């Protein structure tokens, strides 16, 4: 035997490793391209598609505004009612024609500077056609540290990444959810991590950026709920359908969900495709909830709260069903088919449920 013998090589194994690496690199490249295409399609050329406005004006002016396809008009009786519509998040803007021949334009910078700017342009155009002088009032201005009103969007999308990755890492470290105790530990760990994540983001946005106008604990609560909703959904899907399904959900949330959140441009400026998902994906609800508690006194928070609760509850339900199924199958096979368990106690599991999450 030679003193320095070359180690045995396994060509088949080497080819498989090369193929797996190549496929992973191609998949990652396609994922990056999909993100670029999604974000550029949503944000590169914002165009007004649908804006709701409250109007208190003579009928001729109301009819003229109603004739614009991109505007949905709600008629109100007076200035106070119009202003309230905007602050209560029932409309994106409001136009009021005073007896003095002046048009007052109510906008909400806290709901997104792009939307407020678009509303101002529309209002000034209407006023010019009617021969009216126009003034603008911001009923919910953004914080001085966030004049563009986009910090909420960035906080949400990066918490999405943290919650998704955190749920995956916790799953790998703690193992599959095979019994109620493991499920309880996973849930408690996820809740604790979500609190740390929400707390860190809240402190950074408030103390370092100075982008909060107050309501610190409400913002923390909204971020914690959002992180729990995303992390819980990822965990539940992984427990019930396997790691591949959770990866697909994560990719959907990153590629479509982040763009549908409409942070930099606002929902009225999104195309129909993305605006369809805004109220469905957790990102859209997270951004809306943050803005509601920070700038609008909690107005408009009910719908995003319900949406996030549904995402979290769905993930919890999937995890519970998956755990119960595994426990029941284990009991059945150990009772009626004792020979099916090997020396390591491995048992048959239903094909739908993955042992890994």
Predicted regions and their residues:
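Short, Lys/Arg-rich, polar N-terminal cytosolic tail immediately upstream
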Residues: 1-15
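Membrane-spanning alpha-helical segments of multipass transporters and channels
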Residues: 217-357
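Short extracytoplasmic/periplasmic juxtamembrane "stem" segments immediately C-terminal to an N-terminal membrane anchor
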Residues: 50-68, 341-342
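Hydrophobic core of alpha-helical transmembrane segments in multi-pass integral membrane proteins
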Residues: 33, 191-199, 312-322
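Transmembrane alpha-helical segments that form the functional core of multipass membrane systems
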Residues: 153-262
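Hydrophobic alpha-helical transmembrane segments of multi-pass membrane transport/permease proteins
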Residues: 13-48, 157-167, 253-258
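Extracytoplasmic loops/domains of multi-pass membrane proteins
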Residues: 59, 65-141
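Membrane-helix interface and discontinuous TM-entry motifs in multi-pass inner-membrane proteins
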Residues: 92, 129-169
